[in-house]
């Protein structure tokens, strides 16, 4: 679990240091980060309240629904069954509103994958629960990607 928290913090830090060119502040975007390290896979999702506020009259209610949906990680993403990944740990944290970030949700999961070389992408399912046009992604160490509903994958290359 300590590995999950450490890598999650590092990935959030990296996303904040290097937003994609022409993109808004990462605190205003839904983000997903994934890192493969040997047979371990770490996935982190950040959902700021500002990313959903314009899409509903009650952003806190929408965040409550999203947080409940994330109890099953497959609501947010899925993994190729051939990789043989099993969930080792997961955390979903509701962030309190602060002037610099505005609050939201931070979620992270750690998997052990029997055949991690078979894992070429993380399939993103978030578009079905969050009405957004894109997600900022980071596949570590490959780099940043913008993920759209018509090609909802965070690709490892």
Residue ranges of predicted features:
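Bacterial N-terminal signal peptides
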Residues: 7-16
């Amino acid at each position: 679990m300590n590995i999950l928290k450490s890598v999650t913090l590092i990935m959030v830090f990296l996303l904040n240091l290097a937003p994609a060119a022409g993109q808004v502040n990462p605190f205003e975007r839904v983000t997903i980060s994934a890192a493969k390290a040997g047979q371990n896979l770490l996935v982190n999702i950040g959902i700021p309240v500002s990313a959903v506020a314009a899409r509903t009259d009650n952003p806190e209610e929408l965040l409550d629904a999203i947080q409940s949906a994330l109890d099953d990680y497959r609501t947010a993403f899925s993994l190729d069954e051939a990789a043989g990944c099993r969930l080792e740990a997961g955390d979903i944290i509701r962030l309190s509103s602060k002037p610099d970030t505005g609050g939201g949700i931070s979620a992270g999961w750690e998997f052990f994958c029997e055949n991690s070389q078979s894992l070429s992408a993380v399939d993103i399912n978030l578009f079905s629960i969050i009405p957004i046009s894109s997600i900022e992604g980071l596949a570590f160490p490959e780099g940043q990607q913008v993920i759209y509903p018509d090609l909802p994958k965070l690709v490892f290359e």
